[in-house]
Amino acid sequence: MQKQSTTMLSDLPKDVAEEVLSKFPVTSLRRVRFTCKKLNTLSKDMSFTRKHIDKEEAKKKQSKEFHVVMMLDFRVSLFSLNLLNPNPIERLGQLVSLDGGAQVDISNIFHCEGFLLCTTKDISRVVVWNPCVGQTIWIKPRNSFNKWDRYALGYDVMKNHKVLRFVDDGEYGRRHLLCEFEIYSFESDSWEVLDVNPDWEIDFVHRGLSIDGNSYWFARDKVVPYGGQDPSYFLLCFDFTTERFRPPLPLPFQPYFGDTVALSSVGDNQIAVLCQRSSSPYTLKIWISSKVEPNAVSWNKLFLKVDMKPLTGNSFSYSGGSFFVDEEKKMAVVLDKNIGGGFDPTRNIAYIIGKEGYFKKVDLGESRHL
């Protein structure tokens, strides 16, 4: 009797191995890494991660469900959103520790196609993390990190990933107290100083987002203090191929002092912008782009407009917060904090807002991050 040969997963060609790995759910990939060296290497591959995420998202779209990564109370968790369910937002679990040991408090995250750039609460470390497979790359500073640092993760046309770090603590027309712009290349494992003298500024609370490898922020003109001139607000792009900031891009609105503003990504290559007025009736408006490129942006008609006074009685607590939109259902999910009074704790709240008065408030639990 002829002995049958056994084909191991590690013997398969790369394209076949990719197809096999893509059948595993994201939550199982970390265990798969320990089966063999080849699968471990493949599961860490950035192109494979992108393909795996695309397949997962296609499955979720068919089931009217999608997953989002959110940071609550210095922890990064995976949530399931299905706005048709009685319980529309469900925490699936906290993502594993970055270093495999004690939990690390995270102060900020920046997402780029399945990868998270995280900064620690104690400002001592910066890490790029693939939560699907547990891969981490800790990045050492050129000199030192600063508590006012802003970061972005992106890639150039050759798919070389890079990290932008910048801090601009100064006023227009005056001496800069601290102004540093530098970029880290994973390919060379080194930092390079960029020559940037900005006439714009980005508020520290405004986090950027990644579209097609480039990063976008809410920004405004840097004006002379008490000069009597109101700044203009715009969208600002950092191009990771040219390693330069591009000229300002127009917004579909101009905010006033005290208004709540935020950015969110829609799909793989569009941007949503939110603006809520700070005066009654606290009107909330959301627009979605029709085209986004480093040197051009155009906006569709208004996606959602809701007077929030009858629903919440006031405006949201802070600018730069997170929100998501569901284009198909014409709904938005806005994350905020309900500040407790007296001995009442502050709570993390999600507001689900839709057309024709649809409104639902979801309590995500007590907050220890005020």
UniProtKB/Swiss-Prot annotation:
Gene3D superfamilies: 1.20.1280.50. Residues 6-52 form the F-box domain. Disulfide bonds: none annotated. This is F-box protein At2g18780.
